[in-house]
Amino acid sequence: GEYDILFKELEVLEAKHPELITPDSPTRRVGSEPQTGFGTIQHRLPMLSLSNAMNNDELIAFDERMKKGLGTNIDIVYISEPKIDGLGVELVYEHGTYISGSTRGDGFIGEDITQNLRTIRSLPIKLRGEVIPTLLEVRGEVFIKKDDFATLNKTQEREEKPIFANARNAAAGSLRQLDSRITASRPLSI
């Protein structure tokens, strides 16, 4: 899509002008040496599974629970989108710079997958904008698009490796690799 076109343009630009390459460029995310195991990260606020809201009353009840949990009465702005079946993650930015990422885990403590998340090209390492918060915690899903999943399984089959049962398991397994170079080779989106 559009991202892929822009990524190619960036690769061409960096090839012509290496002086423009920055350490946080998406073209530089290739993974690092294997880890010996994952550490843990405690979530500042519990990372709970979201329930479906089927009507306005359920949305209002959700808003009331969020305000109570945050200890505030101010209006909260929500962004909603269709459900994506992937692995729930939390990203932490300090002064606009990505510093850590973790799985949901048990909702209170997750696995530290900072390095593996860093390999996802669409994940911004440095936030841009005029107003950057001191601390920003972002929660979302890492997933593999349907077409990318089909291509991944064809590659697995061609290389005589086991194919993945479904895209969610492929995404989760990719993020939990001790060798982030494997993660970097997978078509993950966030």
Residue ranges of each PLM-predicted region?
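RNA/tRNA-interacting regions in translation and RNA-turnover enzymes
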Residues: 1-190
